[in-house]
Amino acid sequence: LLEKVASSDKVSEFAEKINLTSLDKKLDKVSGGELQKGAIAATLLKEADLYFFDEPSSYLDIEQRILIARMISELGEKKTVVVIEHDLAILDYVTDNIHIMYGSPNAYGIVSQKLAVRNAINSYLEGYIQESNVRIRDSQIKFLKHSPRTGWYGEILVKWPKLSKKMGDFKLEAKAGEILRGQVLGVVGGNATGKTTFVKMLAKVLKPDEGEIDTEITVSYKPQYID
């Protein structure tokens, strides 16, 4: 894909710049983040007058989002760019003006007038576009401070010993741990570091090479991708 829009030397140089490490892998062996970076690289490498990026931060971890946002911002200094994005922080960083889209899903959509970035973001959160005197949502979007959870959780629901799993050249190792009943447990980390593999082992979708998860609980699993 990349060599269709640029020379192999330029592709290699650009891949190093965006930490794209899976140039020689088959598509079905590449993570969503790597696929996203590949698509972004193909767009950036092409010589054009107008560049479109449709949700460029999807599937990217925090560090990668910052890197790609910086590259799109640099591109915007000499080219014209249109970005579709859900991440308001990314939009605030890369754009000069914003159109707000609103309407009814699968029924109709309306494109607002062009707004200054800060006005657009505030209007979107408020649910009201003052410049057009239009309410786009019944309620505001508010960010609430998360308070530490207290209460009834404490019983061990799932417990595991040291786990390991090898998949091709990649090896995942996890220390022994547990999940308490009623707990909301987060997993965070860079793309292609094994987050999905770890969760698949806990959900008993994937069998570890080392260690065994001994539990008879019922599991409902939402995968990263739908096959």
Model-derived regions: residue spans:
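ABC ATPase nucleotide-binding domain signature region
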Residues: 1-10, 86-118, 178-227
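ABC-family P-loop ATPase nucleotide-binding domains
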Residues: 1-35, 46, 159-162, 166-168, ...
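Pre-NBD coupling/linker segments of ABC/ABC-like ATPases
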Residues: 2-12, 103-169, 173-176
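Walker B catalytic motif
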Residues: 26, 53-56, 63
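Conserved ABC ATPase nucleotide-binding domain "signature" region
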Residues: 34-37, 196
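Hydrophobic anchor residue at the start of the ABC signature
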Residues: 40, 68
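Conserved signature/switch motifs of ABC ATPase nucleotide-binding domains
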Residues: 46-48, 77
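Conserved catalytic loops of ABC-family nucleotide-binding domains
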Residues: 71-83, 107
